[in-house]
């Protein structure tokens, strides 16, 4: 059975439910305006462990979604519904892959067909043009397209946005989109940042070029989420376990944003961050923030319940090039967590 036919039926079902809820008060049908986007790379046991999960683990993720009443839709449909101000179904998910590895076609695709789940693949076109070992071919990508899979832009040569000028990045993105269009026909303007790295200037470039941007920082997506850097939960390597994946797939979008500093780029190993937390079905007194799993100090401007802004601080530690601060709060009435993460990038460190 083709992915596109099932996806269309899910889409029609969602629109029908939205209509019914417009006529009735569907308080329980929609809990929060929220969707979780996951990102995978390899589905294999013979590829780098940090970006891989086994076929058995991937099947377990899909079975969890199927058996626990999740709705899986294409990212384009979710973004469109958010931008229209429409209602989103409870427990909504989009599945994505980065890079265009061969195991996506040979292993992940049949499993996703089995469950009838739509998905998106972000490809770097250079390795595919060179027929580089381990990557899909254009012929395989055409078969995915024919099954309703969305093919997104991951640049031409998978270069970090922090390692090239804006003119170079613009040319790289446009070239990749041209190759995708030439081989597969028009595709939505979706761009996943290589390595998940971006600057304020590169986010502005993505908006200028008319793309929706996808990051690799954890968290769910809601109406106020920055669409030049939508969060995605990486679910591979040490994060491939079903217990952790189940928790993350169940999270809710936190209406939160970093107010200071103004950029995620830093040369500090322990930058402080001032975060604005919007209203939601949670107690601000129960917000907890973490740095690599360690609790952070939270200093509210006033009392927690009387303020919407807090500064979070951490201790000095050795860092790599990328890390995240994570803030969560339990939902008042559901066994789910609001989840926000703030990524940091130190481009002086090696990739």
Q: Locations of the language-model features?
A:
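Terminal accessory/targeting
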Residues: 2-91, 110-119, 125-136, 235-351
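Metal-dependent polysaccharide deacetylase catalytic core of the NodB/CE4 family, i.e.
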Residues: 33-52, 68-71, 81-93, 101-204, ...
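Conserved acetyl-CoA-binding loop of GNAT-fold acetyltransferases
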Residues: 70, 211-212
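Beta->alpha turn/N-cap motifs
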Residues: 76, 216-217
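Short, structured coil segments at secondary-structure junctions
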Residues: 115, 209-210
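Short secondary-structure boundary segments
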Residues: 195, 217-218
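Soluble mature domains adjacent to a membrane tether on cell-surface and organelle-surface proteins
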Residues: 212-216, 226
């Amino acid at each position: 059975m083709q992915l596109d036919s099932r996806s269309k039926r899910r889409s029609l079902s969602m629109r029908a439910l939205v209509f019914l809820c417009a006529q009735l008060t569907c308080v329980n049908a929609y809990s929060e305006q929220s969707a979780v986007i996951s990102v995978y790379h390899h589905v294999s046991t013979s590829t780098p462990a940090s970006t891989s999960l086994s076929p058995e683990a991937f099947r377990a993720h899909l079975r969890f979604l199927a058996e626990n009443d999740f709705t899986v839709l294409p990212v384009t449909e979710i973004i469109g519904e958010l931008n229209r101000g429409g209602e989103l179904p409870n427990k909504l998910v989009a599945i994505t892959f980065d890079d265009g590895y061969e195991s996506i076609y040979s292993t992940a695709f049949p499993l996703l067909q089995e469950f009838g789940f739509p998905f998106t693949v972000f490809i770097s076109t250079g390795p595919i043009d060179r027929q580089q070992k381990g990557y899909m071919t254009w012929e395989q990508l055409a078969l995915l397209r024919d099954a309703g899979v969305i093919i997104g832009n991951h640049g031409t040569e998978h270069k970090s946005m922090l390692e090239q000028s804006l003119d170079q990045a613009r040319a790289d993105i446009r070239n990749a989109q041209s190759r995708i269009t030439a081989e597969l026909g028009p595709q939505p303007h979706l761009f996943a940042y290589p390595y998940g790295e971006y600057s304020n200037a590169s986010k502005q470039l993505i908006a200028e070029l008319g793309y929706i941007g996808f990051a690799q920082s954890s968290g769910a997506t809601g109406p106020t989420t920055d669409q030049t850097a939508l969060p995605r939960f990486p679910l591979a390597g040490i994060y491939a376990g079903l217990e952790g994946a189940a928790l993350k797939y169940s999270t809710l979008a936190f209406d939160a944003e970093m107010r200071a500093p103004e950029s995620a780029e830093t040369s500090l190993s322990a930058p402080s961050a001032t975060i604005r937390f919007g209203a939601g079905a949670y107690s601000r007194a129960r917000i907890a923030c973490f740095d690599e799993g360690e609790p952070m100090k939270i200093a509210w401007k006033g009392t927690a319940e009387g303020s919407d802004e807090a500064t979070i601080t951490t201790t000095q530690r050795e860092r790599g090039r990328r890390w995240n601060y994570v803030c969560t709060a339990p939902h008042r009435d559901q066994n789910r967590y609001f989840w926000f993460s703030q990524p940091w990038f130190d481009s002086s460190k090696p990739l």
